[in-house]
Structures are given as structure tokens and as C-alpha cells.
From Swiss-Prot:
Source species: Escherichia coli (strain K12)
Primary gene name: perR
CDD domains for the chain: PBP2_GcdR_TrpI_HvrB_AmpR_like
A Pfam family reported for this protein in Swiss-Prot or TrEMBL: LysR_substrate
Transmembrane intervals: none
Record-linked PANTHER family: HTH-TYPE TRANSCRIPTIONAL REGULATOR, HTH-TYPE TRANSCRIPTIONAL REGULATOR PERR
Protein family according to the UniProt entry: Belongs to the LysR transcriptional regulatory family.
Superkingdom classification of source: Bacteria
BP term (GO), one: DNA-templated transcription
UniProt keyword list: DNA-binding, Transcription, Transcription regulation
Main function: Apparent regulatory gene involved in peroxide resistance in stationary phase.
Protein name (record): HTH-type transcriptional regulator PerR
Length: 297
């Protein structure tokens, strides 16, 4: 306890945030402090412990070997502390705070949300969507549905459905799309933040990618909406476009004549201590069942 008395919690929080984010500025933004305050706190911690925790240069900071060891143990301790707080404050009315990728929320989750609410009327679900990663350390969120492979972290991650990317278009436009080569004469809609894009699809099908695309968006739900309106052919996930395909607003004209791209597009991420949150377990089970992944826990 003598060593712990040397290191106040505010200094440990500043160090943990800086070590995890790799930048004083990012840690400062997260903790709502100034970068100089973060730097001062870490310098004070180093002096108190008589250990150098960071190597500093004009452009970056990197953890020393001692810093890496301390960061691992502090994060483990914070998780234990969070778990203890959850145990003594457990409450049926505690909200479940979900963060998710925008297009997954808009295209897949929202159409099913009514079913979840009807089945679980006592759960206070609060939903937020952005392309940023959820912040668990400040207790902002309980779980996160992220697009793409999550960054390295101590959190649990569950891969969600294997998604299939295929050209999609309106039934009217499909009349002009009988073979893969017909794509060259049509407007191609591209989502610029997508992991796999038209170039990769053309190469997978041993075709030369075109030099230009007609429309570009930074969200899949906008690209899908443009295709529904007949503005072009979009390369998109059949999972995200499930509702439009089922209703006949979009069709897959080349699905039997081309090689499609398969990949794990989304992951469920949450801290281990959140196992103590009963509503999280209910939502996780429901989500996996809806994705036909009920055997994964």
C-alpha cells in the first residue's frame, strides 16, 4: 500500500490514457484536460516512482519496458475496480449503452430493434452511432459493434457474420446488366470507407478495374440508398442490404456468374467486467441469434 499511496488515482488515470492512446493530446481529450496537464501528471508519477515510463521525442512518445509492465497491471486493476463497482451498484434499471458503426445501425439493427424492445421491455437501451471506437474506460458505453478488425485492446471481441459483397442494383438497371462486362457501361457506386472496394472485386474476377467511378460516398447506407434510387450499381454487403433485397428494391444480377468477396465485416467488443451486466448478456444472446450465431458465447 505504500507504493499505492505514492501514486494518486488521477496520476494513474493520466498514465493509463496516455499509454493506451500513445499520445498526450489524445489522453488529454479523453480525460478533458490539457496536454500539458497530462504531461505534468506523468512526470510527477515518474518522479514519485523514480522510474521512467515514457521515451519522449519531438514527434511521439513510446512506453519504456517498465511503462509497458505498469500499463498492463493498471488496466487490469481498473477492470477489477469497474467490476466491483458494477457488483455493488447492480440495478435492473441500469441502462444498456450500445455504440455501433453507423451503417450497421441504420441497415441491420434498426429494422430489428422493435423486436428486441418487444421481447425485452424492461431494458433501457441507449444507442449511439459513429465511426469512432467506444470509450469503455470512462464508462461511456457498455459494448460496441465495430466495422473491421478491432484495434488491439484488452477487451473481448466476438466476430459477427461472414458478409458477402456482390454488385447490387435496382431491378430496372439489372435489365442492362446481364454479364460482368456490362458493368463498364454503367455508373458504379463506391463507398470509400469500405474494407473491400470495386478494384478488389474486379481483380478477384480477373477483370481490369475501371479508372473512374460515378458516385462515391463515405457511408454504406447512403450508397445503398443511391442504388435503390437507380443511380448505379453498388458493391455492398448482402447483410447490410438484406431488407432492400428481401423487398425487391435491389437485386443481385451477377451472383451466379462471378466470384464474390467474403469477409467478417463487424465485431462485437466489450470489457470483460461487463459480464456482470445482465442486460448486456441478454442483448448479446439476441444479437448472435439474429445473426444465426447462437452457438457463440
Amino acid at each position: 500500500m505504500k507504493l499505492l499511496a505514492k501514486a494518486p488515482l488521477n496520476l494513474l488515470r493520466a498514465f493509463e490514457a496516455a499509454g493506451r492512446t500513445g499520445a498526450f493530446a489524445l489522453a488529454a481529450s479523453e480525460l478533458e484536460l490539457s496536454p500539458s496537464a497530462i504531461s505534468h501528471a506523468i512526470r510527477k508519477l515518474e518522479n514519485l516512482l523514480d522510474v521512467r515510463l515514457f521515451q519522449r521525442s519531438t514527434r511521439e512518445i513510446t512506453l519504456t519496458k517498465e511503462g509497458e509492465i505498469l500499463l498492463e497491471h493498471i488496466q487490469r486493476g481498473f477492470n477489477e475496480l469497474q467490476q466491483g463497482l458494477a457488483l455493488v451498484t447492480a440495478d435492473e434499471s441500469r441502462p444498456l449503452r450500445l455504440h455501433t458503426a453507423p451503417s450497421f445501425a441504420h441497415q441491420w439493427l434498426l429494422p430489428r430493434l422493435g423486436k428486441f424492445i418487444r421481447e425485452n421491455p424492461s431494458i433501457d437501451l441507449r444507442l449511439s452511432a459513429s465511426t469512432e471506437y467506444a470509450r469503455f474506460e470512462q464508462d461511456d458505453f457498455d459494448l460496441d459493434i465495430v466495422y473491421g478488425e478491432p484495434r488491439p485492446s484488452p477487451y473481448e471481441k466476438i466476430p459477427l457474420a461472414v458478409e458477402e459483397l456482390t454488385p447490387l442494383c435496382s431491378p430496372q438497371l439489372a435489365e442492362r446488366l446481364k454479364k460482368p462486362e456490362d458493368l463498364y457501361a454503367l455508373t458504379l457506386i463506391q463507398c470509400d470507407v469500405q474494407l473491400y472496394q470495386w478494384k478488389g472485386w474486379f481483380e478477384a474476377n480477373k477483370m481490369t478495374p475501371p479508372n473512374n467511378y460515378g458516385l462515391r460516398f463515405d457511408r454504406s447506407f447512403m450508397a445503398i440508398a443511391a442504388a435503390v434510387d437507380g443511380l448505379g450499381v453498388v458493391l455492398e454487403s448482402k447483410l447490410l442490404a438484406e431488407r432492400e433485397i428481401a423487398s425487391g428494391k435491389l437485386v443481385c444480377p451477377l451472383v451466379n456468374s462471378t466470384s464474390e468477396i467474403h469477409y467478417i465485416g463487424h465485431y462485437l467488443v466489450f470489457p470483460q467486467h461487463q459480464h456482470m451486466h445482465s442486460a448486456l448478456d441478454v442483448f448479446k444472446t439476441w444479437l448472435l441469434n439474429e445473426l444465426n450465431l447462437g452457438k457463440i458465447r
